Amino acid sequence: MTTKLEQLRKLTTVVADTGDIEAIAKYTPEDATTNPSLILKAAEITEYAPLIDASIEYAKAQSNDKAQQVQDTCDMLAVNIGKEILKVVPGRISTEVDARLSYDTEGSVAKARQLIKMYNDAGITNDRILIKLASTWEGIRAAEILEKEGINCNLTLLFSFAQARACAEAGVYLISPFVGRIMDWYKAKEGRDFEPSEDPGVVSVTGIYNYYKEHGYNTVVMGASFRNIGEILELAGCDRLTISPNLLQELEEATGEVVEKLVDTNGNKARPAAMTHAEFLWDHNQDAMAVEKLAEGIRNFAVDQGKLEAMIATKL
């Protein structure tokens, strides 16, 4: 019998959620996603030392200022890891903008353009890159600007329906609604486990997917942040799912039928008027889970970015 991973691939584009090139090569996903935490993890792998050295060499050629060298090294390291990953995936790499720019539209746009230029200078075209931005109002506005320039974006740390709706209305290429982190919040609050079909993260992504398809939005829905394969299988049929190596391994070892749960209705319901900033803030802030998890996610990515910078600073 075919494995659950093989069956899932027939229903959904499988993406690897890791910066570990060896793991990516093992599971042959279509795309790969990275974030500051995954770049930090990858930077600690011995085999990646030459990529760090090359990034430092690049940074030293750009500036004599040590603080600037640290920034440039981190950016180039993310790009160098992305370049290596693109040698083993046929599709796209997602590279994230510094989380400390999450509330700065202009800063996010500038950083995104810089990352794209680094990729372009290395011979990587825009159609192989997604720029990751936090799904704050400012991040969504940055994505709206970048999409018009031909720079596709992946809006991450998405926990509320308000965030999802605003992303679709801004015409962003792809969103990454988080499943496991939503479940974590409800599990802590209610003190119980959830069956996959009633998992609050699964319910959230299902609702977003159906809304997009009913209203004919082209924005790709890529479920992210999974805690178990039950959550993944409940979202079979979603446009894309980005999955960590340990869960890809579980899916590869599991057999049994995988049932398509999400189906594109190709709807053409009338779309509501685009949300205003005030409406977005009001709707998003009605969801205590989303408010807490978005803030926590930004803080944690910023902490790991700081750790990476501290590690790089010792090598300059």
UniProtKB/Swiss-Prot annotation:
Keyword Ligase: no
Active site, per annotation: 132
Assembly description: Homodimer.
Statement: the UniProt record of this protein carries the keyword Transferase: yes
Position of the signal peptide: none
Subcellular location: Cytoplasm
Job of this protein: Transaldolase is important for the balance of metabolites in the pentose-phosphate pathway.
Swiss-Prot/TrEMBL keywords: Cytoplasm, Pentose shunt, Schiff base, Transferase
Enzyme Commission no: 2.2.1.2
UniProt similarity note: Belongs to the transaldolase family. Type 1 subfamily.
GO process terms (BP): carbohydrate metabolic process; pentose-phosphate shunt
UniProt GO MF annotations: transaldolase activity
Enzyme class: transferase
Protein name: Transaldolase
One GO term describing the cellular component: cytosol
Primary subcellular site in the record, as a coarse category: cytoplasm
Pathway participation: Carbohydrate degradation; pentose phosphate pathway; D-glyceraldehyde 3-phosphate and beta-D-fructose 6-phosphate from D-ribose 5-phosphate and D-xylulose 5-phosphate (non-oxidative stage): step 2/3
Reactions mediated catalytically: D-sedoheptulose 7-phosphate + D-glyceraldehyde 3-phosphate = D-erythrose 4-phosphate + beta-D-fructose 6-phosphate
